[in-house]
Amino acid sequence: MFKMPLIVAVVCALVGMGAHAGAACLDVRQSQPLTFKGSLSRPVFPGPPNYEDVKKGDKPERAYIIKLDAPICATGDEFLDSSQTFDTVQLLVDDSANDSRALNASLTQLIGKRVEVTGKSGFGAQTGHHHAPLLVTLVKIAAEGTGR
Protein backbone atom coordinates (compact mmCIF):
# COMPACT_ATOMS: atom_id res chain seq x y z
CA MET A 1 0.00 0.00 0.00
CA PHE A 2 2.72 2.44 0.96
CA LYS A 3 4.67 1.85 -2.28
CA MET A 4 1.89 2.90 -4.66
CA PRO A 5 1.52 6.52 -3.39
CA LEU A 6 5.32 6.85 -3.42
CA ILE A 7 5.53 5.64 -7.02
CA VAL A 8 2.74 8.03 -8.05
CA ALA A 9 4.53 10.92 -6.33
CA VAL A 10 7.84 10.12 -8.04
CA VAL A 11 6.20 9.84 -11.48
CA CYS A 12 4.38 13.16 -10.98
CA ALA A 13 7.62 14.83 -9.93
CA LEU A 14 9.47 13.49 -12.97
CA VAL A 15 6.70 14.58 -15.34
CA GLY A 16 6.76 18.03 -13.78
CA MET A 17 10.53 18.24 -14.15
CA GLY A 18 10.29 17.21 -17.80
CA ALA A 19 7.79 19.95 -18.53
CA HIS A 20 9.98 22.49 -16.75
CA ALA A 21 13.07 21.38 -18.65
CA GLY A 22 11.26 21.86 -21.97
CA ALA A 23 10.13 25.33 -20.95
CA ALA A 24 13.71 26.32 -20.11
CA CYS A 25 15.14 25.25 -23.48
CA LEU A 26 16.67 27.76 -25.86
CA ASP A 27 14.24 28.53 -28.70
CA VAL A 28 16.25 29.03 -31.90
CA ARG A 29 13.23 30.66 -33.60
CA GLN A 30 13.41 33.67 -31.29
CA SER A 31 14.24 36.99 -32.91
CA GLN A 32 16.61 37.94 -30.10
CA PRO A 33 20.34 37.20 -30.58
CA LEU A 34 21.56 33.87 -29.20
CA THR A 35 24.33 34.29 -26.62
CA PHE A 36 26.74 31.75 -25.17
CA LYS A 37 29.81 31.65 -22.94
CA GLY A 38 32.42 28.94 -22.93
CA SER A 39 35.78 27.76 -24.24
CA LEU A 40 36.58 28.02 -27.95
CA SER A 41 38.37 25.24 -29.83
CA ARG A 42 38.93 24.23 -33.44
CA PRO A 43 39.22 20.44 -33.52
CA VAL A 44 39.61 18.28 -36.61
CA PHE A 45 36.69 16.00 -37.46
CA PRO A 46 36.60 13.20 -40.04
CA GLY A 47 34.75 14.19 -43.19
CA PRO A 48 33.98 12.40 -46.45
CA PRO A 49 33.83 9.75 -47.59
CA ASN A 50 33.09 7.81 -44.39
CA TYR A 51 33.04 10.46 -41.63
CA GLU A 52 34.86 8.01 -39.33
CA ASP A 53 38.65 8.42 -39.23
CA VAL A 54 41.06 10.91 -40.80
CA LYS A 55 43.91 8.39 -40.42
CA LYS A 56 41.97 5.96 -42.63
CA GLY A 57 41.53 8.46 -45.45
CA ASP A 58 38.58 10.62 -44.48
CA LYS A 59 39.02 14.28 -45.35
CA PRO A 60 39.85 16.39 -42.27
CA GLU A 61 37.23 19.02 -41.43
CA ARG A 62 37.95 21.76 -38.92
CA ALA A 63 35.15 23.47 -37.06
CA TYR A 64 34.94 26.22 -34.47
CA ILE A 65 33.30 24.73 -31.39
CA ILE A 66 32.33 26.47 -28.18
CA LYS A 67 32.20 24.17 -25.14
CA LEU A 68 29.53 25.56 -22.85
CA ASP A 69 29.91 25.72 -19.08
CA ALA A 70 26.73 23.71 -18.57
CA PRO A 71 24.54 21.59 -20.84
CA ILE A 72 21.52 23.21 -22.49
CA CYS A 73 18.59 22.02 -24.56
CA ALA A 74 17.07 23.68 -27.60
CA THR A 75 13.81 23.77 -29.53
CA GLY A 76 12.45 25.42 -32.65
CA ASP A 77 13.93 23.18 -35.33
CA GLU A 78 12.95 19.73 -36.54
CA PHE A 79 16.51 18.50 -35.89
CA LEU A 80 16.52 19.58 -32.22
CA ASP A 81 15.05 17.41 -29.48
CA SER A 82 14.17 19.32 -26.30
CA SER A 83 14.64 16.15 -24.24
CA GLN A 84 18.34 16.00 -25.22
CA THR A 85 20.93 18.24 -23.59
CA PHE A 86 24.30 19.17 -25.08
CA ASP A 87 27.28 21.33 -24.19
CA THR A 88 28.81 22.15 -27.57
CA VAL A 89 27.78 24.60 -30.28
CA GLN A 90 29.37 24.87 -33.73
CA LEU A 91 30.02 28.44 -34.87
CA LEU A 92 29.55 29.37 -38.52
CA VAL A 93 30.71 32.51 -40.31
CA ASP A 94 28.62 33.92 -43.15
CA ASP A 95 31.38 34.55 -45.69
CA SER A 96 29.13 36.96 -47.60
CA ALA A 97 28.81 39.26 -44.57
CA ASN A 98 30.81 42.49 -44.54
CA ASP A 99 32.55 41.57 -41.29
CA SER A 100 33.43 37.96 -42.15
CA ARG A 101 37.19 38.62 -42.36
CA ALA A 102 37.21 40.28 -38.95
CA LEU A 103 35.14 37.47 -37.42
CA ASN A 104 37.46 34.81 -38.86
CA ALA A 105 40.50 36.69 -37.52
CA SER A 106 38.90 36.96 -34.07
CA LEU A 107 38.04 33.26 -34.05
CA THR A 108 41.63 32.32 -34.86
CA GLN A 109 43.02 34.59 -32.12
CA LEU A 110 40.61 33.30 -29.48
CA ILE A 111 41.15 29.54 -29.88
CA GLY A 112 41.81 28.02 -26.46
CA LYS A 113 40.30 30.98 -24.60
CA ARG A 114 37.05 31.64 -22.79
CA VAL A 115 34.73 33.62 -25.01
CA GLU A 116 31.37 35.35 -25.17
CA VAL A 117 29.53 34.67 -28.41
CA THR A 118 26.51 36.31 -30.01
CA GLY A 119 24.87 34.55 -32.90
CA LYS A 120 21.74 34.25 -35.01
CA SER A 121 20.02 31.67 -37.17
CA GLY A 122 20.51 28.67 -34.91
CA PHE A 123 19.60 25.23 -36.22
CA GLY A 124 20.05 21.58 -35.33
CA ALA A 125 22.75 19.37 -36.85
CA GLN A 126 21.56 17.73 -40.05
CA THR A 127 24.58 16.32 -41.90
CA GLY A 128 27.97 14.74 -41.32
CA HIS A 129 29.50 18.19 -41.80
CA HIS A 130 27.75 19.42 -38.66
CA HIS A 131 29.92 18.69 -35.64
CA ALA A 132 27.75 19.81 -32.71
CA PRO A 133 24.04 19.39 -31.97
CA LEU A 134 23.43 23.13 -32.48
CA LEU A 135 24.95 25.38 -35.15
CA VAL A 136 24.81 29.16 -34.93
CA THR A 137 25.83 31.86 -37.41
CA LEU A 138 28.32 34.10 -35.61
CA VAL A 139 27.56 37.80 -35.23
CA LYS A 140 30.08 38.76 -32.54
CA ILE A 141 32.81 37.10 -30.48
CA ALA A 142 35.04 38.49 -27.74
CA ALA A 143 37.26 37.22 -24.96
CA GLU A 144 35.08 36.72 -21.90
CA GLY A 145 34.80 39.85 -19.81
CA THR A 146 35.99 42.27 -22.49
CA GLY A 147 32.55 42.85 -24.00
CA ARG A 148 34.01 44.17 -27.25
Name each region found by the language model:
Residues 125-148:
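OB-fold/S1-family single-stranded nucleic acid-binding modules
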Residues 31-63, 67-74:
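Structural detector for short beta-strands of small beta-barrel domains
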Residues 77-105:
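Beta-strand/loop nucleic-acid-binding surfaces
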